[in-house]
A protein has these predicted regions:
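Catalytic-core regions of core metabolic enzymes
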Residues: 1-106
Length: 106
């Protein structure tokens, strides 16, 4: 089932957001800004306080509740990030932009 938070979120956080628009997290933010996303935008990046003009938080615990999270981080970090966002920030929808989820070989 597709929920409203995935297709029409009121707030989005980009985990791994960047000022560098050549990086996935930077491209995503640029596209959301250029597309004039009408809701609240946040980024999480421990090295920044602002990313492309939007508020940036050092970690998930500092972040306000957010409906949709876009993860642009290594695959190994994604499961714990999804769990933390769902349980502590009431995040209902996730988009994962990451490599490293390849199938296990035997």
């Amino acid at each position: 089932m597709i929920n409203r938070e995935l297709i029409a979120p009121e707030s989005i956080v980009i985990i791994g957001g960047s000022n560098n628009t050549q990086k996935p997290g930077g491209k995503i933010i640029r596209n959301l800004l250029e597309g004039k996303f009408p809701g609240k935008l946040y980024a999480v990046n421990p090295k920044e306080t602002e990313v492309q003009g939007i508020p940036c938080f050092p970690d998930i615990t500092s972040l306000p509740n957010t409906e949709l999270a876009i993860l642009a981080v290594p695959a190994a970090a994604c499961p714990s990030i999804v769990e933390e966002l769902a349980s502590t920030r009431n995040t209902k929808a996730f988009i994962i932009i990451s490599a490293g989820f390849g199938e296990e070989t035997h």
